[in-house]
Design a protein with these regions (language model features):
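Cofactor-pocket helix-loop regions in the catalytic cores of large enzyme subunits
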Residues: 1-275, 282, 296-482, 492, ...
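Flexible, surface-exposed loop regions and adjacent strand-edge segments
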Residues: 283-288
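Extended, highly charged linker/hinge segments and catalytic-adjacent loops that couple domains
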Residues: 290-294
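Long, compositionally biased stretches
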Residues: 468-547, 551-608, 616, 621-639
Length: 639
């Protein structure tokens, strides 16, 4: 790399974009840390060019949640407010590790416990943060025993959750936990679902879930007794072939008891990035609705294409086969975050141009297109001062609260630009190549109130945006299922959706591998080699395996193994992983993300959401020594 001026960088980008044979040869990727203001301008720039190629990190994580809930309850978001936790009788935490990935949520769970709620952990791993919590800002807790969080742990098989919740529904329907008034007034499809549940055998449920019937019925009894139940989940549910079906099964179970649209109850997908939900709200969507595009045209004058664009997986495929030639990334570390690291790297390297808008160096700066640009931007913690004064941005959290974010630190360099200013600079340069868009990009780059005015006009729910976002706690966006028990679905009601019980079925000799994050890690950013809550030190290339499986394979803690994933006849191999004994169900193993992404097949995706199946990878395990002997024998025979 060598330094160039901002004008030169914007000129290179505009030149490449203007010379494309088709606007769909450009891809505009978005990281979930991008603010509402920058994200709105980013999608506006893409659609001004003429493409809906707007993949984002949600495609890799909670896309399954959005697809499932949009069809079931009419909104691709959760239905819970933060204050609902202290009003709940029962909280199920499924496929989630809040201790490491959502630490502030532990405070909400602690408050719920103090208020009398029961908390149940449903996870192949019983994570330390779910056992006991010491609030770091409470001196008495730090020196004391802390608060016990989980009253019960259910060690479900990897991808056994659909079967588990089918079992819960079966027990609830046979008991007394059904809110027939709610079902009659607000739902559709109950009779068909009831028949499907009746046809599901306990043998099938127990086999697929890995949970004994009496444990399922024990949890179901707690659900029947609960007046207000919350179910939380994260990527432990969203990255399987059947993730959409699994999340809809959870929705079915809550609909039975009417646990949507009342205090202390609801569905709660817990997202990781600070604004992954807000980015989607303001238009980062490769499958935009016609209504949104019409509203965007009426607000900005931009005529958007109506055809759907590429998501993250399809972006890689498009780059690999030459259908996409320019990759622009608003934040993030796409090469490390995506599945099938080798294929993703080759895809980026095939591009004529790759552009990274970043706050710090990452792997994606080293795996690049033929021409590569790094555009350094202000971080959220840095002061953003323009000719119009001190600016702030806004984000939306997992509960649907939009609030402001304003940096106070001195910028690392006087040459840094804000994300909105960078997008506007690219847009002005592009206008100079392909004609005036009619958008006042320069004004938008210095006055973020004017961006928020556009969002208010284009996106429902942002009335009086600039006034309300300045309130200390921000404001809630409308959520019809939560606020009014209004369900904007195809039936006008909340839908019971029926799916067969499915699970990941490895061949003989294979394991089901899930990828997880460590405590000293935030998404693809790794701060240290220790995973303190799991007792793993100075190592990340590890395989967590139960003692039973280790004994069966004749290996010990510390043994080096090679992992090979299998999908539709294709194999991906990664060498020299160190085995660690861990409490995980037999037949399942766990490895760290992003190191194990190289084993996640690119074409192995969730039905309906196209999310990589990073939690359901069928792998074989061979000792590295055994593999070396095998290859030596093969080479000798060939000679």
């Amino acid at each position: 790399y060598e330094p160039i001026s901002w004008d030169s960088a914007f000129g290179i980008i505009a030149e490449q974009l203007s010379e494309l044979d088709n606007p769909d040869e450009a891809i505009f990727y978005t990281s979930g840390r991008t603010s509402n203001e920058a994200a709105f301008l980013w999608q506006l720039l893409a659609r001004r060019l003429g493409t809906n190629n707007l993949p984002d990190c949600s495609n890799m994580c909670h896309e399954s949640s959005g697809v499932a809930l949009g069809d079931s309850i009419g909104i691709g978001k959760g239905t819970v407010k933060l204050e609902d936790f202290s009003k709940a009788d029962l909280i199920l935490v499924v496929g989630q590790n809040p201790g490491s990935n959502h630490p502030r949520m532990l405070s909400a769970l602690k408050a719920a416990k103090v208020a009398g709620a029961s908390v149940v952990s449903i996870n192949p791993l019983f994570e330390t943060g779910m056992r006991r919590f010491k609030h770091p800002q409470d001196p008495l807790e730090v020196i004391g025993q802390g608060t016990t969080i989980a009253d019960m742990h259910v060690p479900v098989n990897v991808n056994g959750d659909l079967a588990l919740f089918r079992g819960l529904s079966k027990s609830i329907i046979s008991g007394s936990g059904i809110d027939y008034n709610f079902i009659s007034k607000y739902t559709s499809g109950y009779d068909e679902y009831e028949r499907a549940v009746a046809d599901s055998s306990w043998d099938e449920i127990v086999s697929a879930s890995g949970v004994a019937r009496h444990d399922i019925e024990k949890l179901a009894a707690a659900m029947r007794a609960s007046s207000s139940t919350i179910v939380c989940w994260a990527m432990g549910l969203t990255q399987h072939h059947n993730s959409v079906a699994t999340i809809q099964e959870i929705a079915n179970t809550l609909l039975l008891g009417g646990h949507i649209g009342r205090p202390g109850a609801g569905l709660c997908p817990v997202r990781g990035h600070s604004n992954v939900q807000g980015d989607r709200t303001v238009g980062i969507n490769h499958k935009p609705s016609r209504g949104f595009l019409d509203s965007l045209r009426n607000t900005t004058g931009i005529e958007s294409p109506f055809n759907h664009g590429y998501d993250s997986v399809n972006s890689v495929l498009a780059m690999l086969d030459g259908r996409a030639k320019v990759f622009l990334s608003m934040g993030g570390n796409f090469v490390s975050a995506m599945s099938d690291t080798d294929s993703t790297s080759r895809a980026i390297q095939s591009c004529d141009l790759s552009v990274q808008i970043s706050t710090k160096p990452n792997r994606s700066h080293l795996v690049t297109g033929k021409t590569a640009l790094i555009l350094p931007c202000l971080g959220r913690t840095e002061r953003d001062v323009t000719s119009e004064g001190y600016q702030f941005v806004s984000v939306e959290n997992s509960m649907g609260v939009v609030h402001s974010s304003q940096g106070s630190s001195k910028p690392a360099s006087k040459h840094l630009k804000s994300e909105p200013a960078i997008v506007a600079g690219m847009a002005v340069a592009l206008d100079g190549k392909i004609g005036d868009s009619g958008v006042s990009w320069s004004k938008l780059s210095v006055d973020y109130d004017s961006i928020r005015n556009l969002i208010e006009s284009a996106v429902p729910g942002f009335d009086s945006y600039n006034e309300r976002v300045r309130e200390p706690q921000g404001f809630y966006l409308p959520n019809p299922p939560r606020d009014d028990r209004c369900f904007n679905t195809d039936t006008g009601r909340a839908n019971f959706r029926v799916h067969p019980i499915t699970a990941t079925s490895p061949d003989d000799g294979q394991f089901v591998m899930m990828t997880i994050r460590s405590h000293d890690q935030y998404n693809t950013t790794i701060y240290g080699l220790d995973d303190r809550y799991r007792g793993i030190k100075e190592a990340r290339r590890v395989v967590m395996m139960c003692k039973e499986d280790m004994n069966r394979l004749g290996i010990k803690t510390g043994t080096l193994v090679d992992l090979t994933s299998h999908f539709e006849g294709d194999e991906l191999t990664a060498h020299r992983w160190r085995v660690v004994e861990y409490d995980i169900p037999a037949g399942n193993i766990a490895t760290y993300f992003p190191e194990a992404n190289c084993l996640v097949p690119l074409n192995s995706v969730a039905e309906g959401s196209n999310t990589p199946t990073s939690k359901s990878v069928c792998v074989t395990v061979r000792t590295t020594e055994e593999n070396m002997r095998f290859w030596n024998r093969t080479a000798t025979q060939a000679a």
